[in-house]
């Protein structure tokens, strides 16, 4: 079966969190929002995992990196 699905459920399309909630500006000081898009190890989650648009993924990446520089978010977490 070339190109077909191999059983299981059909994947649900992820919706962008920012466009669905009407958020236009991503603030680097909003740490609670930024933590939703960072893994437990401190890495920025990719678009295919979070479902964000390319436009907001770029803004999100800049905000997370800025928050890391200001010591609001850690660069890495764990042992």
UniProtKB/Swiss-Prot annotation:
Q: Does the keyword S-adenosyl-L-methionine apply?
A: no
A single GO molecular function term of this UniProt record:
small ribosomal subunit rRNA binding
Q: Give the protein name, as stated in the record.
A: Small ribosomal subunit protein bS18
Q: Which residues does UniProt assign to the signal peptide?
A: none
* Species classification: Bacteria, Bacillati, Bacillota, Bacilli, Bacillales
- Complexes and interactors: Part of the 30S ribosomal subunit. Forms a tight heterodimer with protein bS6.
Main role? Answer: Binds as a heterodimer with protein bS6 to the central domain of the 16S rRNA, where it helps stabilize the platform of the 30S subunit.
Offer a single GO CC term for the protein.
cytosolic small ribosomal subunit
């Amino acid at each position: 079966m070339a190109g077909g699905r191999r059983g299981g459920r059909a994947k649900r399309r992820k919706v962008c969190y920012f466009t669905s909630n009407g958020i236009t500006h991503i603030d680097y000081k909003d740490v609670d929002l930024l933590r939703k898009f960072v893994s437990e190890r401190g890495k920025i989650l990719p678009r295919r995992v979070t479902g964000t648009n390319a436009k907001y993924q770029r803004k999100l990446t800049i905000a997370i990196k800025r928050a890391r520089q200001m010591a609001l978010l850690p660069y890495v977490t764990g042992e």
